[in-house]
Amino acid sequence: MTTGSVLPLLLLGLSGALRAHREDLTVREACKAGFSEEGYTALISPNVLEGEKLLKVEFSSCVGTKGMQYETNSLDFKVGADGTVFATRELKIPSEQVAFTVTARERQSAEQWAAMVRLLVAQTSSAHSEHKKGQTVALDPSQPPNDTLLPWPQHQSSGGLRRQKRDWVIPPINVPENSRGPFPQQLVRIRSDKDNDIPIRYSITGVGADQPPMEVFNIDSMSGRMYVTRPMDREERASYHLRAHAVDMNGNKVENPIDLYIYVIDMNDNRPEFINQVYNGSVDEGSKPGTYVMTVTANDADDSTTANGMVRYRIVTQTPQSPSQNMFTINSETGDIVTVAAGLDREKVQQYTVIVQATDMEGNLNYGLSNTATAIITVTDVNDNPPEFTTSTFAGEVPENRIETVVANLTVMDRDQPHSPNWNAVYRIISGDPSGHFSVRTDPVTNEGMVTVVKAVDYELNRAFMLTVMVSNQAPLASGIQMSFQSTAGVTISVTDVNEAPYFPSNHKLIRLEEGVPAGTALTTFSAVDPDRFMQQAVRYSKLSDPANWLHINTSNGQITTAAILDRESLYTKNNVYEATFLAADNGIPPASGTGTLQIYLIDINDNAPQLLPKEAQICERPGLNAINITAADADMDPNIGPYVFELPFIPTTVRKNWTITRLNGDYAQLSLRILYLEAGVYDVPIIVTDSGNPPLSNTSVIKVKVCPCDENGDCTTVGAVAAAGLGTGAIVAILICIVILLIMVLLFVVWMKRREKERHTKQLLIDPEDDVRDNILKYDEEGGGEEDQDYDLSQLQQPEAMEHVLSKTPGVRRVDERPVGAEPQYPVRPVVPHPGDIGDFINEGLRAADNDPTAPPYDSLLVFDYEGSGSTAGSVSSLNSSSSGDQDYDYLNDWGPRFKKLADMYGGGEED
């Protein structure tokens, strides 16, 4: 066959294939796949056997049912390849119905369809059962599809009594969530058997009808068909409880209300949600397989009793995939993550990131919904790496006598987690330091070992130390881990020589000797030792502290001699011990010195005579009423003190004549009068006191005795107690003089204050506050309210320049702005008021002076104010020149009389009287 004949055949075959493909596409576009019904209902027995066929669902597919797969959301039921629904196990159904969803899935396109299956439990009597078990419910042909009829419970009357027959058990109504409608979608139809006789109106009440959420369900009042008006959401509300009512057209109740239970059938519309998006856990390195790490949890809002809410877990990825890509596994049901492989090593991988997936539908990845979370697993450190020294030997150097000095740093390496007990190093000297001169402390930052001198070393004894140090961790090593040979190192420490100070071997040195040894007496040799035996240095001595300057030291050999007499009773002696400090210095470079203390215990000798106590006393002038107790004080110590001997001297003879001493004990005696009466006064009584030293010392002391008259109780009745108290006559006189001076000063101050007060009152009476124009605003009388005198001659105000001089006329109308040209009247000089406080006399005197003043206007005289007119000599005010007060002459104020004396004094410079 040629090529020309084959080509037309190929084109013809291709054309036919294209035509067949177009026809197949046309058929598919005209075909609509899906279940024959949106819901199936069947009656079943309460007891269902395993494998029992319950009903059959029909599915129409445009490509045939060969590639279809059926599933249910219930583990109790399965669907065969032909659509037959059967039980997977023996069931005892306690409720009135069972509802579940059947899903048809196309394997190639993964497209799926769902239908609701309701299995009603047959619990009614045979008289009311119109269906056979195992068959799909046959509906009334007059009813629309899915018009499930729920008859009202019937009643029967007998003999006038109304008996209710056994009611229908109204099965729950199941509504799948997320239905696409169309809405309203019919659920069931309810009817009463009385609707054949009378018209009946139906209604429903309850949550979802007339209670929020409102109008989720409604009912056709005439036909009784109940509808759902919108898609349901089981996660929002899983069930509804309604009540159905039947009334006639007048609203009268025809039937008792019945309960309707509506259950929302769950659909797989919610993904599992993890409680946390990131989980943190930890596991020890080196853990064995099966070690628990952490638990992740995801919740699904769908029904947990169905596959929609059954969540399963799995690990999606692990990062890093070292040493194995599957180091962990997860329990699919509980979410527990455990190790599945060995080899966890923190020093290699410190952290793993694991992506965990949660899938519902029991983990079916084809049908279930999934979600993911992150699990961060930290590998925690264990002490599986012993610390190791970076080198096997270390060296250091330290001067002798130096402490708390770091002489060497020991470095270690530890691969465990820094700054943890598994990393922190602990150092221990295991040999080479029997005397404990060194310790090794750990630097908390670098983890180094610091070899520190804690006890001074001596170059003359040890010139070097060879230490062996071992290092470990604060935490013990993990099981099976052994210490490394590199955990031990040697440390060589060299000691360098320094110039050490001389020291006194016996420091403090104590010697005992009697006080009073003469100057120049050798006491002891206080020598020092130079520890630098190999330097052959000379030591010189000197005094550092000698408070009383009693001692001398030989600068070469340290011999100490006395430079003065040692006195135990001196203020420089404390508790019989005199203390001095000496200095020993070598001639090294640089020089070094040491100090030593010498303590001299002074043994007491009887070198102090006793002193009589008290120095003053008083006694009654007649004997027998009282006596004076006397004793003695001695600066020495026992046995150079008491018992004391008290006696009166023979000279003067009056002492033994007037006084007598009675011994009480070794320390006390009584001094009393020997005669019957001794005149009052102060007497000096000498008394000889002798101690018990060897040899004994005596002292004659004088006691001042105040002899005074006494009352029946033996107490002095004079002021002698003052003197006895320590106040002499001079002191008393001085106190009295001070008191008198103080009283005089107070009196003078009171007199001065009285005089000042009188002067202030006098000034106030002589000066009217309104007349004092200094620094005050002048107040002039106001002429308001009209003129009192209305009968004066107005012609006096006309042409005042033509009038005769007012001074030549008798007192009447006069000018008050001119100084009178006549002779000034002579006023009587006011006598000095002997008592300025007498206000009445002062006022009367002023009144008489005013009455005798010829220039004083009468009370009812007419005051004529100037009318300047054209002939005024004042001119313009602007012609006035300002001038200082120094340019003015105020002497004329002295001519105005005593009434203006204060003003004249103010402006004329006069002094106030």
UniProtKB/Swiss-Prot annotation:
Protein known as: Cadherin-4
Function: Cadherins are calcium-dependent cell adhesion proteins. They preferentially interact with themselves in a homophilic manner in connecting cells; cadherins may thus contribute to the sorting of heterogeneous cell types. May play an important role in retinal development.
Membrane topology: Single-pass type I membrane protein
Pfam family, one: Cadherin
Record text about domains: Three calcium ions are usually bound at the interface of each cadherin domain and rigidify the connections, imparting a strong curvature to the full-length ectodomain.
Record-linked InterPro entries: Cadherin (IPR039808), Cadherin-like_dom (IPR002126), Cadherin-like_sf (IPR015919), Cadherin_CS (IPR020894), Cadherin_pro_dom (IPR014868), Cadherin_Y-type_LIR (IPR000233), Catenin-bd_sf (IPR027397)
Residue numbers covered by the propeptide annotation in the UniProt entry: 21-166
Glycosylation sites: N146, N280, N409, N554, N629, N658, N699
Main location per the UniProt record: membrane
Residue ranges constituting the Cadherin domain according to the UniProt record: 167-274, 275-389, 390-504, 505-610, 611-721
GO cellular component labels: plasma membrane
Residue ranges, Extracellular side: 167-731
Annotated TM spans: 732-753
Secretion signal, residue range per the UniProt entry: 1-20
GO biological process: axon extension; axon guidance; heterophilic cell-cell adhesion via plasma membrane cell adhesion molecules; homophilic cell adhesion via plasma membrane adhesion molecules; positive regulation of axon extension
Expression by tissue: Distributed widely in mouse tissues with high levels present in brain, skeletal muscle and thymus.
SUPFAM superfamilies per the UniProt record, alphabetical: Cadherin-like
Residue ranges, Cytoplasmic side: 754-913
Keywords: Calcium, Cell adhesion, Cell membrane, Cleavage on pair of basic residues, Glycoprotein, Membrane, Metal-binding, Repeat, Signal, Transmembrane, Transmembrane helix
Compartmental location: Cell membrane
GO molecular function: calcium ion binding
